[in-house]
Amino acid sequence: MATDFKSLPVIDISRLLLKCDDPDMAEDVGVAEVVQQLDKACRDAGFFYVIGHGISEDVINKVREITREFFKLPYEEKLKIKMTPAAGYRGYQRIGENVTKGIPDIHEAIDCYREIKQGKYGDIGKVMEGPNQWPENPQEFKELMEEYIKLCTDLSRKILRGISLALAGSPYEFEGKMAGDPFWVMRLIGYPGAEFTNGQPENDIGCGAHTDYGLLTLVNQDDDKTALQVRNLGGEWISAIPIPGSFVCNIGDMLKILSNGVYESTLHRVINNSPQYRVCVAFFYETNFDAVVEPLDICKQKYPGGRGGCQVFKRAVYGEHLVSKVQTNFAM
């Protein structure tokens, strides 16, 4: 459960990345400091910034800028990669087609998923099968995004080794059958600028309050517009003020289950009060698509009944969880 945090912690993970493939990483003093910070952030807020992550600021900025270029294209051009159920819920959706808790969100987006070969997961994966839809314009869009996905996948794996150390004393709990073949989701999102009445923004909800589905999210947001908000225990909405070159990270529903409720999948939302268009690229690192997710044995031993002794977490199959969300998220 989140605390009454008033800001999100900033964690320099450079030492963790340096030692993350060392079998003796747990004995390194610098790694231990990072692990302690990750543990506290996941318990207190479920959100944190990472710096020292090794992905260049130039790449981070290019990903947002080419996304912005796509959203500036004529509507008819964007519709060439229109999302449909037949396309595996991959592609472009116009403003209002994404729905959170029954309410249309004020954003447009491209949704991409790790591609699933026909029949790989049987009935559970059938609705998600198919290739991603990449636009022909801007040029180099697909090439840049595929490279960015590789970078984010590797970074997420390394951060989760640190979180695994914090939870279980071993860096490898989120590999193998759990996340050795991780699924991923990427959403490229554009939020229109706010309309103003009597000098005040209208406060349209760019994305309604929700939690994320999987293990870990990396948020690449515009440097000059504050819009992402995280709810603390007291019900206050705390702004995730942009820090250039950083990622905002948060944990998802699957990690909450694995931790037996020790780590929080925290409610968050987006309200773009700026008159300018805002771009955000969110990368979601997930378990294996067919992973059966339940509290880790060591978490059941250390934290029986969940945090505070009152929470019970049943097992979930990640792919079923994702499909149930995806099939109700869009008004098409």
Swiss-Prot record:
Recorded GO MF terms: 2-oxoglutarate-dependent dioxygenase activity; metal ion binding
Top-level EC class as recorded in UniProt: oxidoreductase
GO cellular component assignments: cytosol
pH dependence: Optimum pH is 7.2. Inactive below pH 5 and above pH 9.
InterPro entries xrefs: DIOX_N (IPR026992), IPNS-like_FE2OG_OXY (IPR044861), IPNS-like_sf (IPR027443), Iron_ascorbate_oxido_reductase (IPR050231), Oxoglu/Fe-dep_dioxygenase_dom (IPR005123)
Pfam families tied to this protein: 2OG-FeII_Oxy, DIOX_N
PROSITE patterns tied to this protein: FE2OG_OXY
Details of cofactor binding: Binds 1 Fe(2+) ion per subunit.
PANTHER family: 2-OXOGLUTARATE (2OG) AND FE(II)-DEPENDENT OXYGENASE SUPERFAMILY PROTEIN-RELATED
The name this protein goes by in its record: Homoarginine-6-hydroxylase 2-ODD-C23.1
Organism: Arabidopsis thaliana (Mouse-ear cress)
